[in-house]
Amino acid sequence: MATQPPQDQTSTTPSLPPHLDPTTYPRILTSATHNIHLELTYSTLNPTVALEHTSSPAAGANVLFLGTTRDTFEGRAVSQLSYTSYPPLALKSLMSIATRAVEKFDLKGVYIAHRLGVVPISEASIVVAVSAGHRGMAWKAAEEVLEEVKEKVEIWKREEFVDGGMEWRENRERDAEGRILSSTEGGK
């Protein structure tokens, strides 16, 4: 009777579902009609690329927002953040937000990229860039886009603390000034 060769340990390891496998990223969705570029990625975010996507000869204003990982949360030392998502839903939600913003604020371009996986202290987890004919519309649009992304998009955050603790959080638990929102004011 022949003996079976030992199995390679890697072949018995269950594979990750595609939406959790970093090798299947970046996931990108675009709209040439509205100059929209949306991206979910495990790579470091590049604000220069964001501005390249949104710049337009018709734009007199470009607004760029970078959300970065802080080193503390409510007095606890943070070691890093981790993000996860379900890309088909997240990209659909991002496109809806970006398209509404283009129409509402007459934007010339929108770029939204969100990082997934581990995001160390001081690194960006989200970049939002918009361009418009004038600065007032660009400022308002960028803030509204960011708030809607945090409130509506299927992306979840795990805060990992230096003391070894960790907590999963919705992106939308605080307002733009850092105040805690009640469950009736916002959130998923």
Swiss-Prot record:
Annotated metabolic or biological route of this protein: Cofactor biosynthesis; molybdopterin biosynthesis
Catalytic activity reported: 2 [molybdopterin-synthase sulfur-carrier protein]-C-terminal-Gly-aminoethanethioate + cyclic pyranopterin phosphate + H2O = molybdopterin + 2 [molybdopterin-synthase sulfur-carrier protein]-C-terminal Gly-Gly + 2 H(+)
Disordered as annotated region, ranges: 1-23
Source domain of life: Eukaryota
Positions contributing to substrate binding: 134-135, 150, 157-159
CDD domains: MoaE
Keyword set includes Transferase: yes
InterPro entries: MoaE_sf, MOCS2B_euk, Mopterin_biosynth_MoaE
A GO BP entry: Mo-molybdopterin cofactor biosynthetic process
Compartments it resides in: Cytoplasm
Main location group: cytoplasm
Ranges annotated as biased composition (Low complexity): 1-14
Family in the record: Belongs to the MoaE family. MOCS2B subfamily.
Assembly, per entry: Heterotetramer; composed of 2 small (MOCS2A) and 2 large (MOCS2B) subunits.
Name of the protein in question: Molybdopterin synthase catalytic subunit
Gene: cnxH
